[in-house]
Amino acid sequence: MDALPSGYAARSLTPADLDQVYAVYAADELANAGELSIEREDIDSDWSRPSFDLAADAIAVTHAGAIVAAGEIARHGNRAEAAVHPDHQGRGIGQWLESWLADRAVRQGASSIAQIAPQGSTKDRFLIDSGYALAHTSWVLQLPEGAAIPDRPLPPGYALRTATGDDIAAAYEVVQRAFGEWEGRARESYEDWRATIVDRPGTQPWQLRVITQ
């Protein structure tokens, strides 16, 4: 692994770094996607997953004491998140992060590693230039301003309600079975799923609904 540029240093992350890491991820997303979707709570809940070891599975790059880049590896080494603040890009920090994350993924026993990047973005080009290839394509759906979704009644015998009690575990099972059909997708533990869905900071009960028959 190449050394970081002069003036930069690497260290482990702690929960107290959440706000700084969010600021880096947000700045990177704005530069790559042109709009901000990530929320502080997204990172908070990811770090709260029982399977995630923040001290071992994540890294920060600092400059003058401030975090300017960060990366983390999760889901048994198969999924990475990483960002370099736009003000510090083009100095080899991204390459250093990629090497660190790849090494950590191998140590977790992963045979592949993936990260989401907007098509045609700087991050997308960086990953391709680093030897990565497109695995899946996903779309962000948007409802145009002023548009309305027409009411569509459920078929007879079905009912919609807010998930409570045993509904939560049943909803987890449905999600795992549905998305488990994706090639290469590993089953997520119930505890990890809860951390990012039901127990995510700010989540309201109405945000998880189920259809019953």
Residue ranges and their predicted role:
Residues M1-D46, R152-E188, D192:
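Short amphipathic alpha-helix that is part of the acyltransferase structural core
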Residues F179-Q213:
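Phosphate-binding active sites in nucleotide-utilizing proteins
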Residues R11, D57-I59, R161, Q207-R209:
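Structural signal for short hydrophobic segments within the conserved structured cores
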Residues M1-L4, A66-I67, A74-Y158:
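Acyl-donor-binding surface of acyltransferase catalytic domains
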Residues A56, H136-V140, W206-L208:
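Short hydrophobic/aromatic beta-strand or adjacent loop that forms the aromatic wall/cage
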Residues A16-L18, Y25-Q108, P118, T212-Q213:
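Conserved donor-binding loop and adjoining core beta-sheet/short helix segment
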Residues T14, Q119-G120, T164, L208:
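Helix N-cap/beta->alpha junction signal
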